Structure formats: structure tokens, C-alpha cells
């Protein structure tokens, strides 16, 4: 599966190119973009047969793109320049809509726009950029659009140019620059509804970023980009107090009096925040007090209660606790909580208990379960699932390696169901991005020596076998230096700290010291240990911000909770962060459900919901340097089947063909757009 599966704007973009590239040419009637400068000669009438042109357009609009492309090509062979090139570009758009990238690429290569008006070069580059996107070559796609449109290019085409650049930047994970590009697009839109949609896309893009990132990178007032960033922070920080939020919005407008944000946008967000913020007054907590999950439940509850007591007493919900040690009691406990007047349930923790609720049909009150299960048929809409999923980490490792420009992977995971889950998640995500998993090996976590799977993974054992075979044939000693396979870009592995500290040195010893290593958070014990972790030198891994970059001095920091719970087991410390987030998620679940692009900055990651109401965590990345994690920050969130904000904007009309005439054309009026640097670039 290729990256194009995740680019919903593609079809829309091609359709826009197709439906308007050649507007019907009426004899001796000028089209808007062809209006000549006053007093100059009229351009010639189009020689393109109107009936055939209408037929090609009709075929395209009814979805018969191949037939449309064939007719456009046929027309092109009979037309002089520049009508020939215009029709060729229309055919390219048709092939793209038909998913025939091979034909589109070939025909684009045959389309010579040398010497033609700048609009032709721009259209060709935009098509080439689209092909690069479909081939997962995002850097190439963006480089094709680095040159700004010429001044005489129509507003409509300039709009599409900025929208496509914003799309590429978003796919690369560069959300800040994607939002900036949408901001430039915004200044070109005159239709109030279309502009409102675009401004919503700007805020949807920026609210994915953490509050910390927005705060650090926000320029000073009164720049446009800084205004969007501050507005995104206000939206992200909403805590259920309409009066305070209204005051913040009023103060924002005073700080950014000339900002283009429409009043309808601010009012709409204000109303939406009020309706989507869940006020819970009676909260039921279902956690086991005994059994295998009791210690984990205690850690979760400690974090939960620490967050609970940060809320002013008047705003805290009433808590009701239920012992869910026996998973079979889950449904009766849920009914008991409902009958007692609970507004919402937190828990259960056991997967079988979560499964009971998933198969219950409808749930009268919402549930935030503290574990995740595979999707179920007829799963209740108000069942939310939150857990420290290792599958999330494996997928993010794949995304990080892909963003780092790598494509050929090896993997090593433990034997058993846990390792299989991690491997499957890594492989599926890696291959969906366009990467190749060359080989994987498993290891016995109870073993003392992990040399065999490492040797096999690197093909060192095959190299040794060839040496023995040569020595047998030659009947003499053969000078030999083992050589690992050379077709690999990096290694992914999952292991607990003690095992990771053995596997990493083995990879280095067997000639893989220069290979990047990506791992899950399980390689890190949770606190700096330079003496032991020096064996992990160079390894990259994702982990929760609470451990890697927790706010010092906070009442919810790692140190603060360690002081509160001195007897807590270190292996459960990530569950403390999850407990904090489980409480803080409650009022935001409806907002996150309504918009999968929006996030909550949590202690266990940057949190967002998928289409089945499972909470996912975007984690912080670190690299071991001198035995200590060096924080790299959050990796960009890679698209995964979501509709890109702004991709549903109203369609625009593509500019007409520019006749091949020496008469200069009047440039389209363009609103003043800030040049790079005018708005304090970041």
C-alpha cells in the first residue's frame, strides 16, 4: 500500500484541474483571464472544436477519465501551440484521476511548455508534484513548487498552488509551515464561506501542535501567523469556563486588531467549545483491588487522584469506586453505577472486561476504558479506550524512520504474542509508507546469549558458511573477515532494558555500528542511568513526555509523585502518567471525537482519538548520548487515513488557456500578500 491511500485531496485537486483547464471558448468572446490590456489587439479565437471539447469534459465529469484522456490527446494532436499543450495537460489530469500514473507521467514528459506563458509551466509543475506525492517523494514534490507563481497567473491557480504546498508540508509533518501556507492562501480567497473553511483548516492544523511548541515558536504581535498560533492556544486551553474564554478572545482581538480571522470563526469556535466540553459531576471508577492487575490499577489510581486534586474543590466530580477484580462482574457494576447516578465511568482495566462493554450494544453513559481491544461489530459509540499501546510505539518508530529518509529495514523482536503484535504493527505501518522490511528475527527473552538471531539477521552466518565452503573446496585456510548484509538502512527492535543493553552491543560488534537503531520505549528504564545505558549509545526511541521532559516543580511531575508515593514500583511509573491523563481526558473526549485532528497535550503523550474512539499517543523522541536520553522532541504526526483539513474546500475554477500571442495579458489583481520574512518567519 502506497502513501497515496492517505491523500484524499488528490482526487479533488485533479478534478479541479480537469473541469476548468479549458473553459468553453465562444467565438470572439473573451474569457476572464484573457482580457487584453486596454488598446491592444484581441487574442485569436480558439481553434479547438467546441463539441469535442464539451464531450471530453462530459466524460471526465461522469467519471470516464480514460476516455476523456484519450479524447483530450486526440484533440491535442490536431491543435497548434499553445492549445496542444493545454489539452495535453488536461489529459494528464484525467490520467491522474484514473489512477494511471504511468500514462500521466509519460504524457507529462511529452508536453513541452518552453516559451509559453508562465501559467503552463506552473500547471506542468503542479502535475509533476502530484506524481511525486503519489510516489511518496515528498521532498521532490515540494521542490517542484518552490518557485512562486508569476504575477500574471490567475488568483484561482495561485490558490491551488498554496493549497497543494500546504498539503505536501502537512504530509511531511511540517504543521507550522503548512498552516503558514494556508495563511497565504487565505489572503487570496474572497468568498466568505470558502475563507471561513480555510481559516478552520488553519486552526485545525495548528491545534495538532502541543501548547509548548506553539508558545516557544509564536512570533510577537501583531503578525498574522503569531495571531493564528495564539488563537490555537486559546482553543486548546479551554477548560469549561465560557466567561474566561470570551475574555481571552476579546484580549486576543485587541492584541491582533488587523488579523484576518473572521468574526464568524471566533464565534463558531466559542460556541463549539461550549457544546463539546463535557462537565461530569458524578464519576464512577472501576478498577481491580486484587489479582494480577491490582498493582497496575494502584499506579493508575494514584496518578488519577493526583490530577483530581489539582481541580478546585467546587469543580471536582463526586467519585464512586467499584472493585472490578472479577471481569465477569463488569456489566453489573456498570449498571450499578448508572443507577447510582454516575455521569461517566472510568475503567475497567481488564481486556475481557472492556470486551464485555464493547459487546453490550448501547451504553447509557460514556465509558473511558483503561485498555484497548480489537474493533468489535456494533461497538457502542460512547465507549472510549485508552491504553499505553506498544502498537502505537511500533507504528511511530516506522514513521520516524521514514521521515528520517530510510527505506530498508530489519527487525528483531521477542518471541510470543507481545513481540508478534509489535512486529505486525511496525511492518504494516512501514509497508504502508512505502518501506521494505527485508527480514526479521525473534529472540528468546529468557536466553542468556542473543548472538544467534543477530548473526542471522545480519547474514553473518551465511558469510561464515561461505567461508567454510571455500575452505573445504580449496583444502586450505582462507583469509576471511565477516561481512554483514549491505542492503539495509536501519534496525528496529523491541526489548526490555536488560536485553536491549546486550542486543545493541552485539549489532555494533557484528559490523552494524553505523546502522541507525530505532526501538520502542521499553528499552528505557524510565530514569537516566549513564553507566548502564552507555551500551545503548545512538539508539532512538519514543517515550512519554512525563519521563523525558516533565515540567520541573509541577505538582504532577515525576519527582512530586515519587514523593507522594515513595513505595511505588518503578516498573509502573508510566501508568502514573496515564492515570493523570485519564482524568484530564474526560472533559475533552467529545471535542476529540468530533475532530480527529485536534489533540490534548497529555503527560503520556499528545493525545488524539481515531474513528473507533481509541486514544492514541504521539510520543516524544529521544536519542541516547553518553548514556543519557537527549530529547529530540515530538516527531511530526504522519497522516493515516484522515481527511486533511482544508481538503473539502469549495471547488475553484481553473484559469483558461492563454493564447499563443505576443500581446501581453493584463495580470489578475492580487491582494497584498506578505513576502517571506514580513511576518517574523519561524
What label would you give each PLM region?
Residues 460-467, 486-488, 504-580:
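Extracellular/periplasmic periplasmic-binding protein-like sensory domains
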Residues 37-46, 73-83, 109-120, 146-155, ...:
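Solenoid-like repeat scaffolds
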Residues 344-347, 351-441:
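Extracytoplasmic ligand/sensor domains, especially the bilobed periplasmic-binding protein
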Residues 22-25:
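Bacterial signal peptide processing site
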